[in-house]
Amino acid sequence: MNITIISVGKIKEKYLEDAVLEYKKRLSRYTKLNIIEISDEKTPENPSDVEKSKILDKEAEGIFKNLKGDFYVVTLEILGKELDSKELAKNINDLSISGKKNIVFVIGGSLGLSQKVSEKSNFKLSFSKMTFPHQLMRVILLEQIYRSFRIINGEPYHK
């Protein structure tokens, strides 16, 4: 199975970069992981709805450029379905068993995701009703994917 994370924005803080590298290393024994960073658009201080829409559409273009092929697309959205770690592991395992070879997780930028991207999603996943910085969300997602593979393989994990 191949896991791809498409994330709007780049990680700037070294401690978050280090965490991403650590989880990439840990995940390498379970899956091929690819992380794609899409440039985030500069957002004015108080953007109008028109400005927000233009920014989201531009970011969506970058996301769609990387969604060519047979992917099962999971978007991270506040209004998505909340799963516990075992449910996420079951979903990943079920996709693998059903023959899905490529899962793509999409993390939006500071304004979230374009409706166009959300509409292309096979599954909308929510980690919380709270908002997290996209850089931190990437680390949280990687940890949960790692935890999922530990669960799938019957290996111990922290509860």
From Swiss-Prot:
Gene3D superfamilies: 3.40.1280.10. NCBIfam families: PRK00103.1-3 (NF000985), tRNA_RlmH_YbeA (TIGR00246). Keywords: Cytoplasm, Methyltransferase, rRNA processing, S-adenosyl-L-methionine, Transferase. It comes from Methanococcus vannielii (strain ATCC 35089 / DSM 1224 / JCM 13029 / OCM 148 / SB). Belongs to the RNA methyltransferase RlmH family. This is Putative ribosomal RNA large subunit methyltransferase H. Pfam families: SPOUT_MTase. The keyword Mitochondrion does not apply. Specifically methylates the pseudouridine at position 1915 (m3Psi1915) in 23S rRNA. It comes from the Archaea. PANTHER family: METHYLTRANSFERASE (PTHR33603), RIBOSOMAL RNA LARGE SUBUNIT METHYLTRANSFERASE H (PTHR33603:SF1). Disulfide bonds: none annotated. The gene is rlmH.
